[in-house]
């Protein structure tokens, strides 16, 4: 998750003019009206900081090392390997497989895979990598 707006933080509520009579809120007798307005503004600023902290915490939940992000990267890597295997299949049917395709498949298999928290996903990823390694070994034996 990315924060895309850098606009200022506004106060949470609209300020209303207080009646001239007795106010029911807390006030210090020694504080004049100007410093009272300044303290009200500082409280509103603190509220804004709290919301920024909440946004940063939310952003950290979807960070690079988060389980959801690791899972997405693992699935993306598996999709890439499956796409290359599809190209290999088509090239075998056509009878013309290039060294570039074999090299891409080899590099895709050698990439370090991140562990995920999902055992079923890990099993599928292992099967995809095993299939890719077997196909690569067969093609290299045929070519060499």
Curated annotation (Swiss-Prot):
Annotated signal sequence range: none
Q: What is this protein called?
A: Flagellar assembly protein FliX
- Give GO BP annotations, semicolon-separated: bacterial-type flagellum organization
User: InterPro entries from the entry?
Assistant: Flagellar_assmbl_FliX_class2
Do the record's keywords include Cell membrane? Answer: yes
Which superkingdom?
Answer: Bacteria
Q: Can you cite an annotated GO cellular component?
A: plasma membrane
Q: Does the keyword Membrane apply?
A: yes
Spell out the residue ranges making up region: Disordered.
1-28
- Record Pfam families: FliX
Q: Give membrane topology per the record.
A: Peripheral membrane protein
Q: What keywords appear on the UniProt entry?
A: Bacterial flagellum biogenesis, Cell membrane, Membrane
Residue stretches of biased makeup (Low complexity)? 1-15
- Subcellular location field: Cell membrane
As for what it does, the entry says: Required in an early step of flagellar assembly.
């Amino acid at each position: 998750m990315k924060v895309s707006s850098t606009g200022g933080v506004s106060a949470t509520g609209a300020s209303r003019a207080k009646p001239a009579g007795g106010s029911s809120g807390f006030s210090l007798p020694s504080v004049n009206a100007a410093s009272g307005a300044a303290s009200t503004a500082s409280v509103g600023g603190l509220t804004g900081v709290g919301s920024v902290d909440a946004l940063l915490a939310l952003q950290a939940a979807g960070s690079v090392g988060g389980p959801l992000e690791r899972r997405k990267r693992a699935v993306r890597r598996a999709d890439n390997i499956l796409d290359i295997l599809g190209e290999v299949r088509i090239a075998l049917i056509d009878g013309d497989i290039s060294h570039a395709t074999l090299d891409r498949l080899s590099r895709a298999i050698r990439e370090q895979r991140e562990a995920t928290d999902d055992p079923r996903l890990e099993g599928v990823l292992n099967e995809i990598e095993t299939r890719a390694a077997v196909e690569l070994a067969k093609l290299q034996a045929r070519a060499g």
